[in-house]
């Protein structure tokens, strides 16, 4: 809501979950009399979500949309009609969250291709995104993430671009810093040597050292059939982030 207000944007909250019938398919084997009970579970959960929404936001400033059944497809599809998607990080040890698939966040990012702001579950999101770290690679994923983040970058007081072992450093710096400058963003640049064991952890540590409020990066992954596989850096950041991350595939 605060982000939308800062940019004069319209925000919509979306309730998208797997139905109780799909979450507990074995219940139907017990008999048709389970159907009303499962429907009641769904009704109670959506009512709780509506109440939370009403308590948490100004309903004059934020819309509300409900879908159920296929949360991955529903959210990825609706993201196509919005400039930015905001998702909450899922705790890797949270066994209670059965409303969406375990790979919900990564699958929606990859499946929609839209800029997505992922908010960490262990920290309160800052009210202002003043200090931004951009993890740059000369790839379509990075380019889309930077383009999607431009409205936020223009309002930031400090933007730092970091590149890890990207060949011709001078050309890389001139390219990305020049692009940002053309869009009204003054950015610093630094090159880091990638550590072999885990660039994702290295990137998050750098964000902490820089006291960054936001990390911008491409999301790397591929899909086969209905399963999505994330690249190592993307998975580490999604699993271990402690600051908001704007990603795009």
What does each model-identified segment do?
Residues 47, 51-59, 95-120, 181-190:
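P-loop/Walker A phosphate-binding loop and immediately adjacent motor/lid segment at beta-alpha junctions
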């Amino acid at each position: 809501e605060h982000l939308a207000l800062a940019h004069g944007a319209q925000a919509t909250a979306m309730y998208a979950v797997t139905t109780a019938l799909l979450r507990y398919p074995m219940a139907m084997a017990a008999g048709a009399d389970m159907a009303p009970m499962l429907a009641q579970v769904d009704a109670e959960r959506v009512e709780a979500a509506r109440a939370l929404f009403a308590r948490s936001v100004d309903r004059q400033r934020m819309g509300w949309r409900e879908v159920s059944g296929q949360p991955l497809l529903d959210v990825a599809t609706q993201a196509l009609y919005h400039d930015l998607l905001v998702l909450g990080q899922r705790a890797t040890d949270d066994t209670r969250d059965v409303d969406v698939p375990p790979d919900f966040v990564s699958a929606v990012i990859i499946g929609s291709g839209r800029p997505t702001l992922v908010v960490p579950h262990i920290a309160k999101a800052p009210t202002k995104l003043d200090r931004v770290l951009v993890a740059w690679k000369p790839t379509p994923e990075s380019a889309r993430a930077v383009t999607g983040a431009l409205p936020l970058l223009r309002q930031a007081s400090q933007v730092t671009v970091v590149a890890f072992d990207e060949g011709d450093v001078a050309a890389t710096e001139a390219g990305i810093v020049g692009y940002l400058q053309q869009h009204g963003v003054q950015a610093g640049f630094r090159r880091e040597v990638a550590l072999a064991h885990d660039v994702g952890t290295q990137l998050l540590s750098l964000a902490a050292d820089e006291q960054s409020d936001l990390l911008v990066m491409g999301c790397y992954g591929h899909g086969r059939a209905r399963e999505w596989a994330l690249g190592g850096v993307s998975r580490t950041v999604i699993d271990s982030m402690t600051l908001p991350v704007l990603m795009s595939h």
